[in-house]
Design a protein with these regions (language model features):
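Terminal-region recognition feature
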Residues: 1-183, 197-268
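Catalytic-center loop of serine/cysteine hydrolases
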Residues: 178, 188-189
Length: 268
């Protein structure tokens, strides 16, 4: 098998490793004084989306994290990180609250995709994702999204229409899973590795395509030096973004470039 083909899917499998730090691990180690807020104020809550208030060094921020858990016992009540409409609407409520109180927003993304069950469709999963995208596009406060492991389809994008998109070196970002792609295109699960390579879903691919703005090295992943470095990087970037009077306009322009094959910057 082609080494490049097998390599892309190997990175996907590594990103799915249950031992990798999850959203709650980042909240506990990067931020301080975290206060979790519950409910979408429309009648539901979703434990797969953890959100609330915290300090990043001395800066009050709103944190939104997709949480999988590590063990099967932890993952089942959190739907293995597949966020339901109630979770995205909770995130929407906290985004609007952040806008009202002038707090930057940090999103931690780790999902194979949004919830796709019958109840999710009945409760408006598509609309919930669309509302988040609309809200993120118009926020006047700085917003940074970090893909910490899996970044699957619209479920990830719903928390990633942001000023900066960072990816851990071992994360991936894709419109569809390699398994789903192989099934749709070729009806052949044996071509999953080939699909992974075709999707250009690794962090290196995303940076080259300017879908991601920064790759975070995984040296000391899950250890204090790693979290300390990330905290410092976030604080510095929020300070820079907070001084930009054209934040919303630049965010809009960044995403409007996607799919523009005539762009002369070499991204597409």
């Amino acid at each position: 098998m082609n080494r490049t083909v097998s390599g892309a899917y190997a990175e996907v499998e590594a990103a799915r490793n249950s031992a990798r730090p999850t959203g709650i691990d980042y909240i506990s180690n990067v931020f301080s004084s975290f206060i979790e807020l519950h409910g979408d104020r429309r009648g539901g809550d979703d434990p797969s989306l953890v959100g609330g208030l915290a300090y990043l060094e001395r800066q009050p921020v709103t944190v939104l994290a997709i949480e999988k858990g590590h063990t099967a016992k932890q993952r089942q009540p959190r739907s293995f990180g597949s966020v339901h409409p109630e979770g995205y609407r909770k995130a929407l409520r906290l985004m609007r609250q952040a806008q009202k109180f002038h707090r930057p927003v940090i999103c931690l993304v780790d999902t194979a995709g949004a919830g796709c069950g019958l109840a999710d469709e009945q409760h408006g999963i598509g609309q919930a994702i669309a509302e988040n995208l609309t809200e993120l596009a118009g926020l006047s406060v700085p917003v940074i999204s970090i893909l910490i492991s899996e970044g699957g389809s619209g479920g990830a994008l719903a928390l990633a229409l942001t000023d900066e998109v960072w990816m851990l070196k071992g994360a991936y970002y894709s419109v569809i899973s390699p398994e789903g792609c192989a099934q749709i295109l070729w009806k052949d699960p044996a071509r999953t590795s080939e699909a992974a390579a075709c999707l250009h879903l690794t962090a290196d691919d995303a940076l080259k395509l300017k879908v991601a703005d920064r790759i975070i090295p995984e040296t000391d992943l899950g250890k204090k030096p790693f979290y300390d470095n990330l905290r410092g990087s976030l604080a510095s970037e929020l300070e820079r973004l907070g001084k930009d009077p054209e934040l919303t306009e630049k965010r809009y322009a960044r995403f409007r470039r996607f799919g523009d094959f005539a762009a002369d910057d070499g991204a597409f």
